[in-house]
A protein has these predicted regions:
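Active-site neighborhoods and metal-handling regions in enzymes and metal-associated proteins
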Residues: 1-193
């Protein structure tokens, strides 16, 4: 069964209203494209290499947004490095997702981590979610210092790196900002098969 159809079937069986957006299931030949089109594949998924599964659900009117990275088979050292860099950026940037920290600080940290390895993330580090899939604020270096994380916000944390030869890696979790830090409310991770 197509992975996109499987997700939609399972979410409806579990009380969700619908997907938050069209599910992206990009295998190794297309995972480098960030938002590959079409979002589904009729080939083996996941194939050997790096794949991305980006999906969201709507539950009680609110939208989630998550991305899993799937590593299947034996990877090259360069592919392993992409996985490690994205995981490192996710771990480090999560520490910046707290009350009164400028959102741009988190994105600057991710860019710094990637730049040390001559890599660049071609999108923002995250965005608000709620009734809509993309809400204020964008976790971007273009935001001003007065735009800060505040309790009650739910913000995605989605570091990603993409290489046409190696494939793409993105980890995306939804993070609730609390009065004393944050709570990761989704459970995306790198899955090894």
């Amino acid at each position: 069964m197509d992975v996109s159809l499987l997700i939609e079937k399972e979410l409806r069986l579990n009380g969700c209203e619908r997907t938050g957006f069209d599910t992206l299931a990009a295998g190794p030949a297309r995972s480098w494209a960030i938002h590959a089109f079409p979002g589904y594949t009729n080939g083996e998924w996941p194939g050997n290499g790096l794949s991305i599964l980006d999906f969201g659900v709507v539950y009680n009117g609110y939208t989630s947004d998550t991305t899993l990275a799937v590593a299947k088979g034996e990877l090259s050292p360069e592919q392993e490095k992409l996985l490690a860099l994205v995981q490192h950026a996710a771990d480090e940037c999560l520490r910046r997702y707290k009350k009164d920290v400028p959102v741009k600080d988190a994105c600057e940290l991710a860019e710094k981590i990637f730049a040390k390895e001559n890599r660049k993330m071609p999108h923002t580090l995250g965005h608000g979610i709620g009734l809509e899939i993309h809400e204020f604020p964008r976790v971007s270096t273009k935001m001003t210092a007065d735009v800060t994380f505040q309790p009650g916000m739910i913000i995605t944390l989605e570091p990603g790196l993409y290489d046409e030869k190696l494939g793409g890696v993105r980890l995306e979790n939804d993070v609730l900002i609390t009065a004393d830090g944050n709570e990761v409310i989704t459970h995306s991770r790198i899955i090894r098969l």
